[in-house]
């Protein structure tokens, strides 16, 4: 594609002297080759402007800058991140305009809600692309996932592939980092869903206000906003919304959709979805009140995109729990072992509360906190565990460059250190062995924090760690053949 075509919808200072043919738009100077367009972006640890000359030397046809560098083949823009996303979209012939786009954002529940919406659309005959934390799923094909929301080159490559393979919709998790970094700039969504917001990612955003401001961006460019009215900050999302607003709630009758006659069972939830006199019975195979909210978010979104309520209900009834979200490990033990991605204070609290009713014995929780991430949530995680668990084992999560012992020390600040049922074991495998060794019949063991992840980030290494297989190995069971698709 010619430079003049790429810049058709991107304002810039300068003139196109050489209307070169471009086949790659990148912000990574190491990938530059002839016929590339290099975009200079200020990252936290590196300013792409310092690599502009290297990019030109490697054959880049031109560079896009935010700062004036005085280079011959320089196109200066007001916001290079925004330009990057729009240029990648143009290079792929705007596949986002050929799909029905649904974005889901919030601290907790994004993966479950996007998966459920994808299931409902697929069951209704709409081939759908799913992008998110666990995997990218094109129709029935699972593709590897790196970031929760892909960077522009990967995102538009996925969208383009989806269009070419007959997809009519895309459901994506919209992370706060992606929204803050402008990865979704230029996309007009058909629907945006807000699940909830609690403290997370403050290591990146700095303040909670910056965090919620990033989330709001999704609703400024959506024709339809689906908002969880149970969240204390829901009105801020509503105020930021530019399109039609639809609300849902498990408790408030003023919402457009409410949940009535809620039954929280040991392994599922039942409730009636009520709106304007219409009642639809909903079942979803995941416990806890948050599962009601997740199912409501998916159903309300689908219904307002034209899906019949009964069809949405039928799809939810046959949907299974998402990988690493309240996932039960099949291990033939006299106690239950559950794996969940809960890695925030609120997330851990919600999962522990969901498991309590079905726990006939002690509720045992094993967890840690990520290194090089928000340190202020660590004692809050410890406090949540102390409030809801009978036995606590504090261990490592992804310590990254931090000392695991220091991270554990931060967690312990929020606990009652006099508790005789609180244990510390920095080695996660040994901690899992301790949890299983001390579990008794009827107990529930929650392995929190890793969820779908099958690795640990320690130092500069990515080391294999599949908690399912770790449990099975400790118990002397054979290797699992694999988890069934949702």
Sequence positions of predicted segments:
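ATP-dependent carboxylate-amine ligase
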Residues: 1-13, 31-37, 47, 242, ...
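N-terminal leader/targeting and accessory segments in enzymes
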Residues: 1-86, 90, 232, 258-263, ...
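Phosphate-binding loop of NTP-binding sites
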Residues: 7, 84-229, 233-244, 296, ...
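Acidic, Mg2+-coordinating active-site environments of NTP-dependent enzymes
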Residues: 9, 65-71, 165, 180, ...
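Short gly/ser/thr-rich secondary-structure transition/capping motifs
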Residues: 15-25, 84-87, 150-153, 172-179, ...
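Short, well-ordered alpha-helix to beta-strand connector turns
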Residues: 22, 34-35, 60, 71-72, ...
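Short, ordered loop/turn segments at secondary-structure junctions
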Residues: 67-69, 133-134, 176, 197, ...
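A short acidic, helix-capping loop that chelates divalent metal ions and anchors anionic groups
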Residues: 71-72, 137-142, 199-204, 373, ...
